């Protein structure tokens, strides 16, 4: 009722303002006069324009809030709250003139109390808006919502104290209490506010959790989660984080001397638990602080004299002598030498000798004589050495002088002929190579054939003189042109396709078509990947694709390989366009070398160019051949550095916040979220010898056979589309066809080889040229994954050309493992039509590049609604974390938590997973299970369209 009376009053007031008494009087006095045809009119007044609109407000405790609005030109302004007009008495109105326009500005203000808000029933919040009138009409302002502010006392989840080792990641969870407006969260470390911009070791996630990337000793502290809004401020219980250090042993000291100088004893060495010392309750070092071991010191043996020898004959000096040796035993192990003299002499004439000689028993006389002889010999040796040195020096001087005079008259004809360059290691081809003379003999496809042959020039007659001048020795090299051929192994196999010009023009004959291989092509390609100039990048249409993308994103796909690159919307900065490429590296040299039980599980894929600025991760999809259900794998993603060596990017299930990517592992493919483009490969390692790789076996035979020999080639390949496609391309060049559909084989990490054998051959018409009962492919050749097109060849010979039917069995199995049997029946006179073409055009899209919205299944508008609804965490938990769980992408949620829009990254990954046959139904089902019915309606509507 009050609202109606207020409306009536407003209408009456408007009529009074429009009524002019002078017009009424004139009509009364001269009612009989004719009215003029027209009246002078004032300029039309515009619609009211709001200078100030009411803003959202919160009622704190019992204090009412004020809502105000200003508009011009306006004759009246009234508030309408929840669809009903506010009483005129509740309005406070002020009027003024706008200095710039001279128009009348009206300002109205009302108060909304807590009681008014609480009296409202229904799901909608209390709202008010202004309605302004002018002679031109009315204008409505925005709705301002008035809510009662509050903040609950109890946190939904409080942080818990932890003890963590040094350098480990720490996660402290906090869910603030419910409140209006939503509480802001900050973390305190010992009562100091944590600012991640100042200390990058801290990270605050979108759901208010605190992550310490690498725990330091200084991070040992008390942590408190604080939630606050305009009403109150709440503190959680304090969580104490203790960063401890486990003790580590120092290096062992040197062994002490043996305790016993002679015989058996013991010695010890020590170490201390100081590397590092245990801190903050860390564990003490395990093991002994000292080691003790037995030792044996060989006892010293003192020397002893032997018996004296017999006396010698009497000499001219009238003396005879005798000797002894210190050999009974000799001194050993540091024992003392014998004391006494070696020689003993005495007069042998009983004093009748008249000569006065020194007795031989005088040791000093013998020593003097010996020293004199030594000096004499030394002097002679020195003199001879000096004379020889002088003679040699004179000879060298004379020789050099003669050579200098002789060289001025000599012309080196060989140097003139070759221009100062000498050929090194010229080798001619061997024409006796059976692979070249007999194309029917099956080649060994496991050996690569990247052979370079340069032009051969005939040497000139040595009698011809070429004068030496100051001109360059060699003319400038002509520009280089590289012709690229697909793989071929027989001498008659022509090249299939020419590559793009990479460097220029090369003289004809540099690369013969019968020996050109993909290996050289890929070496040249990988050498140029660092450049962002894509015009000179050689491209193989079957293994590479490129496209230009902007901020709307898109998708690159290599048909028939399962390799693709998804560029999400917003990954490329606004206003920029990148030409991006995706290629599969075919050369074996582009794969990492396997170490131990490690194996390559995917092709080596390059996406580029490197160094691009990306605003959000792109998704690279690669097929793999691991049997993930075995659950005995250690999976790793590796990237190739600029120096060519491979580096580990991430080990699955060992991610940290510093991990630069995320891997979503599916049964047959892995989807990798990348911030940096480059060359990547997926590898695995078995840690208990029970991991299993998926292989596929394919049997090929010649499409036409005009000789008595007939070859069956059995390939053992990784179970990926890329591996089969490469072999199909190879066999097309060899003129082979696929005898039977490829069969799968589970190959176990057991060190057992793969054994192939031929059975049930009709010996009346055929015979096998294989001498052994079976062939084997070594285990490591298969398990490493770095060798391509592994195969064995069974060469058969028919007794006559009239034999055109061949039936046999080929058994392929791993020793003590699984196997497959091929039952072959073929007719040599017939060529199965399209057997290779059918597989080469296997299922899968042939579209290589999709741009903008055409590359995505979720429309941008629906995607934005889903992100807005799920990005913000809530107490019920039906946010982006539950979406990741429903879509089986919750292996490491912290990766998504660090992104500005976790939901957006999850939806990007979902787009990559649904490339081939996905629709919106799976996403709609996940949203329905989460209780997001409003999102479900939008998704279902778009899905029906």
UniProtKB/Swiss-Prot annotation:
Extracellular side: 27-377
Name listed for the protein in its UniProt record: Netrin receptor UNC5B
Modified sites of kind Phosphotyrosine: 581
Intrachain disulfide bonds: 69-130, 81-128, 174-225, 258-295, 262-299, 273-285, 314-348, 318-353, 326-338
Region listing for UPA domain, in residue ranges: 689-838
PTM comment text: Phosphorylated on cytoplasmic tyrosine residues. Proteolytically cleaved by caspases during apoptosis. The cleavage does not take place when the receptor is associated with netrin ligand. Its cleavage by caspases is required to induce apoptosis.
Signal sequence, start to end: 1-26
Phenotype when changing residue 412 to N: Abolishes cleavage by caspase-3 and subsequent induction of apoptosis
Region span, Interaction with DCC: 707-725
Gene Ontology terms, MF aspect: netrin receptor activity
All residue ranges annotated as the Ig-like C2-type domain in the record: 147-242
Coiled coil: none
Primary localization: membrane
């Amino acid at each position: 009722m009050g609202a109606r009376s207020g409306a009536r009053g407003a209408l009456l007031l408007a009529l009074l303002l429009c009524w002019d008494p002078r017009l009424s009087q004139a009509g009364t006095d001269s009612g009989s006069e004719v009215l003029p045809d027209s009246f002078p009119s004032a300029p039309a007044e515009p619609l009211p324009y709001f200078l100030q609109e009411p803003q959202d407000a919160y009622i704190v405790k019992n204090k009412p809030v004020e809502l105000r609005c200003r508009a011009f030109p306006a004759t009246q302004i009234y508030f309408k709250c929840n669809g009903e007009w506010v009483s005129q008495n509740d309005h406070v109105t002020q009027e003024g003139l706008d200095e710039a326009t001279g128009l009348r500005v009206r300002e109205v203000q009302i108060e909304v109390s807590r009681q008014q808000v609480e009296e409202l029933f229904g799901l909608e919040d209390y709202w008010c808006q202004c309605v302004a009138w002018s002679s031109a009409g009315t204008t409505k302002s925005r709705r301002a919502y008035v809510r009662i502010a509050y903040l609950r006392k109890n946190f939904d989840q409080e942080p818990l104290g932890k003890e963590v080792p040094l350098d480990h990641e720490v996660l402290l969870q906090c869910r603030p209490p419910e409140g209006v407006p939503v509480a802001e969260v900050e973390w305190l470390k010992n009562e100091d506010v944590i600012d991640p911009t100042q200390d990058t070791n801290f990270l605050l996630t979108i759901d208010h959790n605190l992550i310490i990337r690498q725990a330091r000793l200084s991070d040992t502290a008390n942590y408190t989660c604080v939630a606050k809004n305009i009403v109150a401020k709440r503190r959680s219980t304090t969580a104490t984080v203790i960063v401890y250090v486990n003790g580590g042993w120092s290096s062992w000291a040197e062994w002490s001397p043996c305790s016993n100088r002679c015989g058996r004893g013991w010695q010890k060495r020590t170490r201390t638990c100081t590397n590092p010392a245990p801190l903050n309750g860390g564990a003490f070092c395990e093991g002994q602080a000292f080691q003790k071991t037995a030792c044996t010191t060989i006892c010293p043996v003192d020397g002893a004299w032997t018996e004296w020898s017999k006396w010698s004959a009497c000499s001219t000096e009238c003396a005879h002598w005798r000797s002894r040796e210190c050999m009974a035993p000799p001194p050993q192990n540091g024992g003392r030498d014998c004391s006494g003299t070696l020689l003993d002499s005495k007069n042998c004439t009983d004093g009748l000798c008249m000569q006065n000689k020194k007795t031989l028993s005088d040791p000093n006389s013998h020593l003097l004589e010996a020293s004199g002889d030594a000096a004499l010999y030394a002097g002679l040796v020195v003199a001879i050495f000096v004379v020889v040195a002088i003679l040699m020096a004179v000879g060298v001087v004379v020789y050099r002088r003669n050579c200098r005079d002789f060289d001025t008259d000599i012309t080196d004809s060989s140097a003139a002929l070759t221009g100062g360059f000498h050929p090194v290691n010229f080798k001619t081809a061997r024409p006796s190579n059976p692979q070249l003379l007999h194309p029917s003999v099956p080649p060994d496809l496991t050996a690569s054939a990247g052979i370079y042959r340069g032009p051969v020039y005939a040497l000139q007659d040595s009698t011809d003189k070429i004068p030496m001048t100051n001109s360059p020795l060699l003319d400038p090299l002509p520009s280089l042109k590289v012709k690229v051929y697909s793989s071929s192994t027989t001498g008659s196999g022509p090249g299939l396709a020419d590559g793009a010009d990479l460097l220029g023009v090369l003289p004809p004959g540099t690369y013969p078509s019968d020996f050109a291989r993909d290996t050289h092509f890929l070496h040249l390609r990988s050498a140029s990947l660092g450049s962002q100039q894509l015009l000179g990048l050689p491209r193989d249409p079957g293994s590479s694709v490129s496209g230009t993308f902007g901020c709307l994103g898109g998708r690159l796909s290599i048909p028939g390989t399962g390799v693709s690159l998804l560029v999400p919307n917003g990954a490329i900065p606004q206003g920029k366009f990148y030409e991006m490429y995706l290629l599969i590296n075919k050369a074996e040299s582009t794969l990492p070398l396997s170490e131990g039980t490690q194996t390559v599980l995917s092709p080596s894929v390059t996406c580029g160019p490197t160094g691009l600025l990306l605003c959000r991760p792109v998704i690279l999809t690669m097929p793999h051949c691991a049997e993930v259900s075995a659950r005995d794998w250690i999976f790793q993603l590796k990237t190739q550095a600029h120096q060519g060596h491979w580096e580990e990017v991430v080990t699955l299930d060992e991610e940290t916040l510093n991990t630069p990517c995320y891997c979503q592992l599916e049964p047959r493919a892995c989807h990798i979220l990348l911030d940096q483009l480059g060359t990547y490969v997926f590898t695995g390692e078995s840690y208990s010898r029970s991991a299993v790789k998926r292989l596929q076996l394919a049997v090929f035979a010649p499409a036409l056979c005009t000789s008595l020999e007939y070859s069956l080639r059995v390939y053992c390949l990784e179970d990926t589309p890329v591996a089969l496609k490469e072999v199909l391309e190879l066999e097309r060049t060899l003129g082979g066809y696929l005898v039977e559909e490829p069969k799968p084989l589970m190959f176990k990490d057991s060190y057992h080889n793969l054994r192939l054998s031929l059975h049930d051959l009709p010996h009346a018409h055929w015979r096998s040229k294989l001498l052994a009962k079976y062939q084997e492919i070594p285990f490591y050749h298969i398990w490493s994954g770095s060798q391509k097109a592994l195969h064995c060849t069974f060469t058969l010979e028919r007794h006559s050309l009239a034999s055109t039917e061949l039936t046999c069995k080929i058994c392929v199995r791993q020793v003590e493992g699984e196997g497959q049997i091929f039952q072959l029946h073929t007719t040599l006179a017939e060529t199965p039509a399209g057997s290779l073409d059918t597989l080469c055009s296997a299922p899968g899209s042939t579209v290589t590049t999709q741009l903008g919205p055409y590359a995505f299944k979720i429309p941008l508008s629906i995607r934005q609604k889903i992100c807005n609804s799920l990005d913000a965490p809530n107490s019920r938990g039906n946010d982006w974390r539950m979406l990741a769980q429903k879509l089986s992408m919750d292996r490491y949620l912290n990766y998504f938590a660090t992104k500005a829009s976790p939901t957006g990254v999850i939806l990007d990954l979902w787009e990559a997973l649904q490339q081939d046959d996905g629709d919106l139904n799976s996403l709609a089902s996940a949203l329905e299970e989460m209780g997001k019915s409003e999102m479900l309606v939008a998704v279902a509507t778009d899905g029906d369209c």
